[in-house]
Every structure is written in structure tokens, then in C-alpha cells.
Amino acid sequence: MPINRLQLNITSLASDETTWKKPKTIAIIIAWSVINVGILMYVFLFAGQSMEWYFMTLLFAVSVYAGAILEDIKAIILGGFEALALTIILAYVLMIIPALIGQISGFYQQNLVLTIALGFLFRMMFPLGIVLIVIGGLIGGLLEGWLT
């Protein structure tokens, strides 16, 4: 009986490391984003309109740790930008929830909330936030490679 070309070889699939790294990489990127969103939301709700140095240090430390866990330079670079995009999207959605659910009445008031949230994210993430997240991930990957 001839073997179909589309038939999977289970033993080679089980021995392939990249197959099992994919869910781990996705989980790390999501966790990286959620922690970054937590830091940004704390600043948005309690710390005012300026991001102090210790919040930037937290963003950098989380990125170093995520880069050390990810290990692969390609996963770190792509994952850093994916985490950054997911962070911005999640933080923006969380900031505009009152306008989305109708707690803020009036078209102009809703647009004001959307504009304030976008302005806050722009001030917090561009350019220093992006640089800290990407460079922190790269440094974490380099540290992990150097320590092993």
C-alpha cells in the first residue's frame, strides 16, 4: 500500500522542537502584553499624565524577562512588535470602555474620551516605550544566550 504524501509522520512531528515552541511563544507574547497593559493602565488611572522612570524601568524589566524566556532572536524581534501592537490595542480598548458601553452620553464627549486615550497612548509609547520594549527583549535574549 503506497503512503500518501499528505500523511503525517507522527515520530518526526513529535521530535520537532519548533512545533512545541509555538504555543509557548504565543503564551509568552500574550503575557508580555498583558503585563505591559497593566503598567500602562496603572499610570493612566493613578499616576497622572506623565510616565515616571520607575514605570519605564518596569516596562524594560518585563521585556528583558520575556526576551530571556523566548530565547530565539527571531521570536524576540517579531514577538516584541506583536506584544507592542497587542499592548496598544488592549490598552486603548480598556481606556475607551466607558464610551463603548454608553456610560458617556453625547457624541462629542465620546470623541473626547477616544482622543484623550489615543493621546495618552501616544505620549507613553512613542518613542521611548517602543525602544524600551524592543531593546529590553533583545537584551534579555542575549543575556539568556550568554548565561547558558
PLM regions: where:
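Canonical alpha-helical transmembrane segments
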Residues: 56-80
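Hydrophobic alpha-helical transmembrane segments
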Residues: 75, 116-139
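Hydrophobic alpha-helical membrane-insertion segments
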Residues: 74-97
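Membrane-interfacial segments
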Residues: 43, 47-48, 74, 94, ...
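Alpha-helical transmembrane segments of multipass membrane proteins
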Residues: 32-40, 86-91, 132, 136, ...
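Membrane-interfacial helical/loop segments at transmembrane boundaries in membrane proteins
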Residues: 101-120
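Short, charged juxtamembrane terminal tails flanking transmembrane helices
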Residues: 1-9, 141-148
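N-terminal signal-anchor transmembrane alpha-helix
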Residues: 2-55
